[in-house]
From Swiss-Prot:
Upper taxonomic lineage: Eukaryota, Viridiplantae, Streptophyta, Embryophyta, Tracheophyta
Keyword DNA-binding carried by entry: yes
Sample GO molecular function, one term: RNA polymerase II general transcription initiation factor activity
Record's protein name: TATA-box-binding protein 2
Subcellular compartments: Nucleus
Subunit structure: Belongs to the TFIID complex together with the TBP-associated factors (TAFs). Binds DNA as monomer.
Keywords, alphabetical: DNA-binding, Nucleus, Repeat, Transcription
Superkingdom field: Eukaryota
Classification via PROSITE patterns: TFIID
Coiled-coil ranges per UniProt: none
Disulfide bonds: none
Source organism per UniProt: Zea mays (Maize)
Pfam families: TBP
Purpose: General transcription factor that functions at the core of the DNA-binding multiprotein factor TFIID. Binding of TFIID to the TATA box is the initial transcriptional step of the pre-initiation complex (PIC), playing a role in the activation of eukaryotic genes transcribed by RNA polymerase II.
Any single Gene Ontology cellular-component annotation: nucleus
Amino acid sequence: MAEPGLEGSQPVDLSKHPSGIVPTLQNIVSTVNLDCKLDLKAIALQARNAEYNPKRFAAVIMRIREPKTTALIFASGKMVCTGAKSEQQSKLAARKYARIIQKLGFPAKFKDFKIQNIVGSCDVKFPIRLEGLAYSHGAFSSYEPELFPGLIYRMKQPKIVLLIFVSGKIVLTGAKVREETYTAFENIYPVLSEFRKIQQ
C-alpha cells in the first residue's frame, strides 16, 4: 500500500496540486510526553537498541527498524521521534518506543503527541535563476552562495522555510500539517517558473 504523497503511486489531484507536483515527505519530527520520570542509565543497559552518553547528550538515543526512526528519550519523560516519512508512521513509532519503555518497567503513558515539523522535498525539473529571485523577493530571501549553495526563502503564509537550489530541487521545512507543505509549494511554484533559467 503506497503512502499518500509518494510520487508515481497515484495520479495527482490537480485541484489540490495545480502545479502537478506533490512534495514528498522526507522526515517527520514529533514529540510525546511519557508522563513519568525515567532512569536513562537503566534504559540504556536493558534496551538492545539504545545508546546513552550523558557527557555528550542528556538523552537516550534509541532506534527501531519499522518504522525506521530514532527517538531521543529524556529523564523527564519527554520524547522526540524523528525519521518517519508520514504522520501516521511517526505516531506508530512513538507508540512503539513508549511500549519498549513500559516493558522495561516504567509506568509510561502517551500524552500530548504532537507533530512538530514536517520536511518535504520535490524537484521542479528546471533550473532556477537564484540571483534574480533573491533580488526581486529580497524581503523573504537570503542567498549567499559562498556560504550555502541554496536560496533560503522564508514564507510568511504559511510559515514555511524553503531551500531552493539552482538545479530545481526544493526542500520545505517548518510545517505542522502536510497541507502547509503543499500550500507553500503551490505558492512558490509560479515564482520559480518566472525565474526559470533558459538553457543555452
